[in-house]
Amino acid sequence: GASGSSRDVIFVSTTDATPGYHSHPLDAGTWQIMLGAYVVSPDGVDVKINLRFTPKTRRWFKGDLHTHTLASDGRLPLDHLARHAREHGLDFIAVTDHNQPVKRASFPKIPGLTIIPGLEWTHYKGHSNFLGIEHPYEGSFFTNTEEETQQKFREAHKNGALISINHPLESDFGFHFDLEKLPYNMIEVWNGPMRPRNIEAIGWWDQMLKAGKRQVAVCGSDYHEDTVFQRLANPTLNVLAWSPSEKDLLEAIESGHSYFTYSPTDLHVDLYVEDATYGVIKHWREGLQATLNAFALEACDQIRLIDQDGSRILFDAPQKGDWQSNLKVMKPGYIRLEIWRTFFPGLPSMPALVTNPIWFD
């Protein structure tokens, strides 16, 4: 980039830069700094350049992995969707129109927002997001047999797509292909507003965990338009990543460094076992302890611990506030958390927050 003489401080990073400059990875090597001086004395001019490098640090980012635009059956063009996401406080979205690939070159430049290319592979027998790639497969999306479906998934996986199985237990749009024969990375266990089918999907996923499968879960709003029941980032994927770059976000999502909330809320739970948190596999030993910090609880919120032996209530919040506790990790397996909340008087409580597990071997 370049700028006029009135600017004496600039910054460049992988995801952002001073206006007039382009974001760019700070690759190792020799970089050139060009300085213009309008008037130079015969003795020359002394120039002092200060360089400050800020290393990456992991932090939380909020986003939505499942959105639609006018390119399929959504109601907003992509630029409106992107602005809508930023207005909701989101740091990233994935664009997943039905069987419609999208090019990064078409993405609007919205400060503070990372847009991830993807598509929702849509078939009468199941839906699946292919994320992080513009062209996951060649030819038509459609398949007529299980074998053709397997080939489509294998091709997308080989090309680098991150694959999620969407709303697997929905009555009208469930997933009816054989998962054992498909390559995939994640399962979308929370799709749109919390409802019985999502609770069933979370339970189904937990049975996988209890059977020893280290399966990462995700969530997505399946956003098409704002209605009484549907909102962008309802639910929200909260991701612990090194930066908001597409690469860092997708690596963290694939690894399970995430939890899900009903909206871009302040509700937050940190769960650490020494240096390990969600999605990490840690060696178990006697005396291992987990540290839990919950923030922005509402009165009557219930924190539940789920492990290979079942579920137990850790805390019933008597009022708004935060809560901290230390827990013993009793044996190998996994631990994860859920926070249940009663959103309306007279209705049953439902999950307001769900985490991925920490695993122990």
Predicted regions and their residues:
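A metal-dependent hydrolase metal-coordination microenvironment
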Residues: 55-182, 188-205, 211, 220-227, ...
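Edge beta-strands of jelly-roll/beta-sandwich modules across compartments, strongly enriched
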Residues: 40-52
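Short beta-strand-plus-loop segments that form exposed binding edges in beta-rich domains
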Residues: 33-41, 340-344
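Ligand-binding face of N-terminal immunoglobulin V-set domains in extracellular IgSF glycoproteins
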Residues: 13, 17-21, 27-36
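Surface-exposed beta-strand/loop patches in noncatalytic accessory domains
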Residues: 1-18, 311-313
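C-terminal functional module detector
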Residues: 53-54, 223-361
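Short tyrosine-centred short linear motifs in exposed loops/low-complexity segments
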Residues: 26-31, 41-42, 331-333
